[in-house]
């Protein structure tokens, strides 16, 4: 299909402006019918890709969707024919991105189709939430690790952020069906309880979270071969940042935040940095290495559940203590170390702590 050549929009699409109805005479703009018919070209593409269950795919036929790409009427019609596909997901910003864009498009155009699509997207998020309060990566697709509680790439925290905006009637989300407000608040409350229950206890001490947790046992679990049960120095940041947004945080939430921040502090890799270098001996002529750099601080993407030591895992699923010990393809194609918690530790947590000291 022609539309299958599309790629996922960068987060910047949220800043794109809706197309004006330039062909209409100025006098017609004030008429209610003309306002209702106003269109946003990006929103129209989102409507075409929305699945009948309310969610959106991140890709079609393994090719990612790009709402910036022009689509003809035939392309839009072809996209609509896949409405019954069961590939809706919250991975890679799918669904949460569209909902957020569409509520703003509705405010700007007053096109009721955008409001309805956003509301159906919100209902999709409510439907996909599991009894534990967790959110799977895909719904209703349960193959592989897709049904597990997914913090990976901040999928669950983004879903909860949208639902919290609905519950709080924040900004343009105040325009959606009022019946969704209490439902969204209930979902947020359940999600917070899931976050608290999945925070890993290591030798009697609360620490952080895995990128995926088993939907039944709530324990850390495996995803891809190189994503073993472990503690995440990346996704755990977004979880804590979400908890910081809660009004009147309970003592349990405050303890969880304090424990996670303490874990980030003790899990630092100090005086090291990551560097991308040219290396003619490698297959693609490049490599990614960890180098000594006084004053720099890193955190690993994965930490061993027992020892809390950084682990680096390639496609063979074997743990290694050094980035250099895994294959070049993974070293250069995946991010195993970064500075993710830096802003949380330096700015966000200290500011929050002034208002909400640890219990």
Task: Kindly label every feature range from the protein language model.
Residues 1-7:
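Bacterial N-terminal signal peptides that target proteins for export
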Residues 20-42, 165-190, 216-223, 227, ...:
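Terminal, non-catalytic domain-edge segments
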Residues 22, 28-35, 79-94, 143-156, ...:
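Solvent-exposed loop and edge beta-strand segments that line ligand/cofactor-binding
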Residues 40-96, 101:
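N-terminal carbohydrate-binding/catalytic regions of secreted carbohydrate-active enzymes
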Residues 41-54, 117-134, 185-204, 256-273:
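Long, well-ordered core segments of solenoidal/helical folds
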Residues 56-57, 61-62, 69-82, 131-142, ...:
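Intrinsic, low-complexity N-terminal interaction/targeting segments
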Residues 115, 119-122, 126, 143-199, ...:
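Eukaryote-skewed repeat-based solenoidal scaffolds used as protein-protein interaction platforms
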């Amino acid at each position: 299909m022609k539309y299958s050549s599309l790629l996922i929009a960068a987060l910047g699409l949220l800043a794109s402006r809706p197309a004006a109805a330039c062909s209409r005479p100025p006098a017609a703009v004030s008429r209610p019918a003309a306002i209702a018919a106003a269109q946003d070209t990006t929103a129209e593409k989102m409507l075409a890709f929305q699945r009948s269950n309310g969610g959106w795919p991140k890709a079609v036929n393994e090719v990612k969707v790009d709402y910036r790409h022009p689509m003809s009427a035939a392309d839009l019609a072809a996209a609509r024919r896949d409405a019954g596909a069961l590939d809706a997901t919250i991975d890679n910003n799918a669904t949460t991105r569209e909902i957020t864009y569409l509520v703003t498009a509705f405010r700007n155009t007053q096109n009721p189709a955008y409001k309805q699509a956003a509301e159906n997207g919100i209902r999709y998020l409510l439907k996909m939430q599991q009894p534990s309060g967790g959110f799977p990566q895909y719904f209703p697709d349960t193959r592989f690790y897709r049904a597990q509680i997914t913090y990976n790439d901040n999928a669950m925290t983004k879903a909860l952020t949208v639902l919290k905006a609905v519950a709080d009637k924040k900004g343009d989300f105040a325009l959606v069906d009022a019946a969704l407000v209490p439902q969204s608040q209930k979902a947020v409350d359940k999600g917070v309880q899931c976050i608290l229950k999945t925070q890993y206890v290591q030798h009697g001490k609360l620490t952080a979270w895995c990128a995926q947790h088993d939907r039944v046992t709530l324990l850390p679990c495996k995803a891809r071969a190189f994503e073993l049960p472990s503690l995440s120095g990346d996704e755990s940041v977004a979880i804590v940042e979400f908890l910081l947004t809660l009004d009147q945080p309970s003592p349990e939430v405050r303890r969880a935040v304090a424990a996670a921040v303490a874990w980030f502090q003790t899990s630092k890799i100090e005086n090291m940095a990551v560097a991308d270098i040219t290396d003619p001996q490698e297959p693609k002529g490049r490599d990614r290495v960890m180098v000594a750099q006084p004053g720099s601080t890193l955190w690993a993407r994965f930490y061993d559940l027992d020892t809390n030591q950084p682990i680096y895992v390639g496609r063979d699923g074997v743990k290694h203590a050094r980035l250099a010990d895994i294959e070049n393809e993974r070293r250069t194609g995946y991010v195993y170390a970064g500075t993710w918690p830096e802003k949380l530790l330096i700015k966000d947590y200290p500011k929050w702590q002034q208002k909400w000291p640890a219990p």
